[in-house]
Amino acid sequence: MFGLKQFYQNEVRAKLAQELDIKNPMLLPKLEKIVISVGAGAHAKDMKIMQNIAQTISLVAGQKAVITKAKKSVAGFKIREGMAVGAKVTLRNKRMYNFLEKLIVISLPRVKDFRGISRNGFDGRGNYTFGINEQLIFPEVVYDDIMVSHGMNITMVTSTDNDKEAFKLLELLGLPFAKVR
């Protein structure tokens, strides 16, 4: 699984330069990092479930997950400062491209009634975020090892500042966006 990075360097960069009319190759948009995160929600109080969530994300990403803690107390959500509220992993370079390739080729096709990911996940600054409802679409996750079914948010951070260039980059990399009706 090393093909996506070389595909980007050999083919995608040339197409981006042509379609976006960018002369300087250093200004071409590129994928900088992918952040996978999970909010524990109601399960935040149970440390065993938090450990299980972190372990699941670690399996999916191929890198150790960090348990995120609350920055301040919120009485309405029954959260205290310093309490574990989720887990996240930041992927860069080789692991990032391996994860993206696995996501595109293996995991997303396993989603029931999959018609493409939404085009509405761009934030206006060239970053794209989408959610996955269930972690079982990843081949590393074994059903018997799961304590609680949870989804995850996947954020792709690009080097560009506008959504049009980021969309073109992700589309050329092979992300299956939903068709416009």
UniProtKB/Swiss-Prot annotation:
Listed GO MF terms: rRNA binding; structural constituent of ribosome; tRNA binding
Quaternary structure and partners: Part of the 50S ribosomal subunit; part of the 5S rRNA/L5/L18/L25 subcomplex. Contacts the 5S rRNA and the P site tRNA. Forms a bridge to the 30S subunit in the 70S ribosome.
Q: Which UniProt keywords apply?
A: Ribonucleoprotein, Ribosomal protein, RNA-binding, rRNA-binding, tRNA-binding
Query: What domain of life?
Result: Bacteria
GO-annotated biological processes: translation
Instruction: Write down the InterPro entries for this protein, in alphabetical order.
Output: Ribosomal_uL5 (IPR002132), Ribosomal_uL5_bac-type (IPR020930), Ribosomal_uL5_C (IPR031309), Ribosomal_uL5_CS (IPR020929), Ribosomal_uL5_dom_sf (IPR022803), Ribosomal_uL5_N (IPR031310)
Q: Which family does it belong to?
A: Belongs to the universal ribosomal protein uL5 family.
Q: Protein name, please? A: Large ribosomal subunit protein uL5
Q: Which Gene3D superfamilies match?
A: 3.30.1440.10
The record's annotation in NCBIfam families points to: PRK00010.1 (NF000585)
